[in-house]
Swiss-Prot record:
It comes from Emericella nidulans (strain FGSC A4 / ATCC 38163 / CBS 112.46 / NRRL 194 / M139). This is E3 ubiquitin-protein ligase RSP5. It holds the Pfam family HECT. The gene is hulA. SUPFAM superfamilies: C2 domain (Calcium/lipid-binding domain, CaLB), Hect, E3 ligase catalytic domain, WW domain. Belongs to the RSP5/NEDD4 family. Residues 1-112 form the C2 domain. Interacts with apyA and creD. Keywords: Cytoplasm, Repeat, Transferase, Ubl conjugation pathway.
Length: 821
């Protein structure tokens, strides 16, 4: 074939750029360069572009070809070029006669998908080249020796090099700094552009996009995530792609997602109406959140529907029917007792004629008749095989109340308790052992005990006086910042009185709940650059490591810490949820590799592979990491002299620990310390440390009322069908669980107890919308496993309802931390 080639070069090949190369290394980006070959005789090499998946070369080479010549362009990683696979990143093969007529002449722009080699290594991305028969203009690669040096220097900083635009082309579109993440493939869309009308001169488009000649192929600009080829998206909308390359849209105004692009007539009024509707849904869900101490078994939802098999007739032959018992259990009402007073009790009357009762055993008095009967739920196996039993007993049977407590009755004869130590009331009897019985799961005993202990501490007692906070609804973030930061920590511990400007409401709890609901929506909004959505999904938050773009960011983090502490202190909930590692950091626990899954799924997978495999001769790493900040890439040593310390099988565990700590903790250490300084002004560190990270999430955000029907409706199955016995048993079990157990299951399978505002249909994974999935996987003797990044539960085919409930309960309730797969 070489004998048929012309004596002089007749084709100019411009290797413009590659886009979306495969990241083959675990912790660093490749240093790509391209090699162009014709017939194995003519070989040309581009310069090396440092640390990028989107290299931009724009280098020209003149070749001797005929129509049967095969142009092969391979891409390699320069750092691994001496390895066995030479750092291969992909190849394209182009038969010249298929794309350009050498006799007629022409100019063709090609975009080709990179292909695998014989080694079958995974490759990804596209290569953009230009073929031209016009060699009359000088080759700048030969004429200007500075070209490669300048190109390499500019690109190594993470910026796409720009070519000065011709005056006839307006400088428009986003800057190259905004687009530093990629030389967007959106601008390289045509795979072949007809050459008939293509002139030989090329005009560099704005934003440093690869040069595309004037003519029929009109280039699309590099598009930001807030626009697409139809134009700018409405305010608050963002365009994203899932792992399959499908485009979906995120509405940050309502925190929802959709496959459909918001229409052009999506005006401000439509946006406002939809936002208000979603706000009402979120507000209602937020106000229904509670904690175990806020309800006894008497107020468990749908008790009459979910636990009929666990009910037993009340002791003592009271004649009350089962339905009446369930009704009284659900309302917490009591019935008048008869017969003699218990031993040591005496009935007396005040001067006004009101009866009261004296307990000479404990030298206490009460308004409540000790003979009055109440119905309580006792945990543990009963005769019918159920887990709970409803029993009737006198209110005095449990013995004296703790010091500072008082028992009272509502006008519906329901008993409630006043804690004069903390000036609070509760339906929950502090003496009641029902939810502390041996049959109760350990997590439930622990959490409730911890809450009772936590609330009873002197540091958590509301001080005398009032703390007035006045805010405007439309400026709640800045007003709250000014009000809360001007007051001392001791003032914030007084009774919180919220006042909305222009509104007459008095704060008996409702206004403060509304205040924390609105404020948590505003201060955790990613548009303020203080927090960002995690890689895990679109509704769990993590600290933005680049929050320093706001010079006052540390003051704001201290303010946010105060707000979180204030909500816990005054027993309110925030409508916000963080990654699991954030709660561990609040408890001063050491983060682990498992916590990385919610922060960076790819890095978690790569680090896990590193620990489980022999890396000698495979991974060429040192104790450093690359960090990019506003387009500038820096190399950071994980330990002193880390750049000169190679990672080996012997020290890889230390390396993984250091990478994990840097990625989760060190990058945001300054911001987190400011947050904790504000938080600990109201909540002492030694008190909050009684909780684990899952319990802390529930303490801050509360427990949601979960719609099991909606959950089931938006669930996919792999290896199972909805009619299978295991699946039927699974949903039966979930329906019998109370709200706290359902929240624990949601935490276990998705990584958070938060439900999207529009229900489970909007559930997010690490790669976009991802429905809850139950997969048939595992041995029936093993426990279920979860994959929180994919909202997936691996459920073995258990043979019976009882085995499934036992295994699922252990996996969900007894597992501490985020150690699931």
């Amino acid at each position: 074939m070489g004998s048929n080639l012309p004596a002089q070069p007749n084709l100019r090949v411009t290797i413009i750029a590659a886009d979306g190369l495969y990241k083959r290394d675990v912790f660093r980006l490749p240093d790509p360069f391209a090699v162009a070959t014709v017939g194995g005789e003519q070989t040309h090499t581009t310069s090396v572009i440092k640390k990028t998946l989107n290299p931009y070369w724009n280098e020209m080479f003149d070749l001797r070809v005929n129509e049967d010549s095969i142009l092969a362009i391979q891409i390699f990683d320069q750092k691994k070029f001496k390895k066995k696979d030479q750092g291969f990143l992909g190849v394209i093969n182009v038969r010249i006669g298929d794309v350009i007529d050498l006799q007629m002449g022409g100019d063709e722009m090609l975009t080709r998908d990179l292909k695998k080699s014989n080694d079958n290594l995974v490759v990804h991305g596209k290569l953009i080249i230009n073929l031209s028969t016009n060699l009359s203009t000088p080759n700048p690669n030969q004429a200007n020796g500075l070209h490669r040096t300048q190109l390499g220097a500019s690109t190594s900083s993470g910026l796409v090099p720009q070519v000065a635009p011709t005056p006839s082309v307006p400088q428009a579109g986003p800057s190259s700094v905004d687009q530093s993440a990629a030389a967007s493939s959106a601008s390289l869309n045509p795979q072949r552009v007809p050459s008939a009308t293509r002139p030989t001169s090329q005009i560099a488009p704005p934003n440093g996009a690869p040069p595309i000649a004037n003519g029929q192929g009109v280039p699309r600009p590099n598009l930001s995530s807030f626009e697409d080829n139809q134009g700018r998206l409405p305010a608050g909308w963002e365009r994203r792609e899932d792992n399959l390359g499908r485009t979906y849209y995120v509405d940050h105004n309502t925190r929802t997602t959709t496959w459909n692009r918001p229409s052009a007539n999506y005006n401000e009024q439509t946006q406002r109406t939809q936002r208000e509707a979603n706000m009402q849904l979120e507000r209602r869900a937020h106000q229904n959140r509670m904690l175990p101490e806020d309800r006894t078994g008497a107020s468990s939802p749908n008790l009459s529907e979910t636990q009929p098999q666990a009910q037993t007739p009340p002791a003592g032959g009271s004649g009350a029917s089962n339905s009446n018992v369930v009704s009284m259990m659900a309302t917490g009402a009591t019935t008048a007792g008869t017969g003699e007073l218990p031993p040591g009790w005496e009935q007396r009357t005040t001067p006004e004629g009101r009866p009261y009762f004296v307990d000479h055993n404990t030298r206490t008095t009460t308004w409540v008749d000790p003979r009055r009967q109440q119905y309580i739920r006792m945990y543990g196996q009963n005769a019918s095989g159920g887990n709970t039993t409803i029993q009737q007993q006198p209110v005095s049977q449990l013995g004296p109340l703790p010091s500072g407590w008082e028992m009272r009755l509502t006008n519906t004869a329901r008993v409630y308790f006043v804690d004069h130590n903390t000036k609070t009331t509760t339906w929950d009897d502090p003496r009641l052992p029902s939810s502390l019985d041996q049959g109760v799961p350990q997590y439930k005993r622990d959490f409730r005990r911890k809450l009772i202990y936590f609330r009873s501490q002197p540091a958590l007692r509301i001080m005398s006086g009032q703390c007035h906070v006045k805010v405007r609804r439309n400026n709640i973030f800045e007003d709250s910042y000014a009000e809360i930061m001007r007051q001392s920590a001791s003032d914030l511990k007084k009774r919180l009185m919220i006042k909305f400007d222009g509104e007459d409401g008095l704060d008996y709890g409702g206004l403060s709940r509304e205040f924390f609901f609105l404020l948590s929506h505003e201060m955790f909004n990613p548009f303020y650059c203080l927090f960002e959505y995690s890689a895990h999904d679109n509704y769990t938050l993590q600290i933005n490591p680049h929050s320093g773009v706001n010079p006052e960011h540390l003051n704001y983090f201290k303010f946010i810490g105060r707000v979180v502490g204030l909500a816990i202190f005054h027993r309110r909930f925030l409508d916000s949820f963080f990654i699991g590692a954030f709660y561990k950091m609040m408890l001063r626990k050491k983060v682990s590799l498992q916590d990385m899954e919610g922060v960076d799924e790819d890095l978690h997978r790569n680090l896990t592979w590193t620990l489980e495999n022999d890396i000698e001769g495979i991974i060429d790493l040192t104790f450093t990491v690359d960090d990019e900040k506003f387009g500038e890439r820096r190399t950071i040593e994980l330990k002193p002299g880390g750049e000169d310390i190679p990672v080996t099988n012997e020290n890889k565990h230390e390396y993984v620990e250091l990478v994990t700590e840097w990625k989760i903790v060190k990058r945001v250490e300054e911001q987190f310390n400011a947050f904790m300084s504000g938080f600990n002004e109201l909540i002492p560190a030694d008190l909050v440390n009684v909780f684990d990270e899952r319990e802390l999430e529930l303490l801050i955000g509360g427990i949601a009322d979960i719609d099991v029907d909606d959950w089931k409706k938006h669930t996919d199955y792999r290896g199972y069908q909805e009619q299978d016995e295991v699946i039927q048993n699974f949903w039966k079990i979930v329906r019998t669980w109370d709200a706290e157990q359902k929240s624990r299951l949601l935490q276990f399978t998705t990584g958070t107890s938060r439900i999207p505002v529009n229900g489970f249909k909007d559930l997010q994974g690490s790669d976009g919308p991802r429905r809850f999935t139950i997969e048939k996987s595992g041995d029936p003797i093993a426990l279920p496993k979860s994959h929180t990044c994919f909202n997936r539960l691996d459920l073995p085919p258990y043979k019976s309802h009882e085995v499934l409930e036992h295994k699922l309960s252990i996996a969900v309730e007894e597992t501490l931390g985020f150690g699931q797969e």
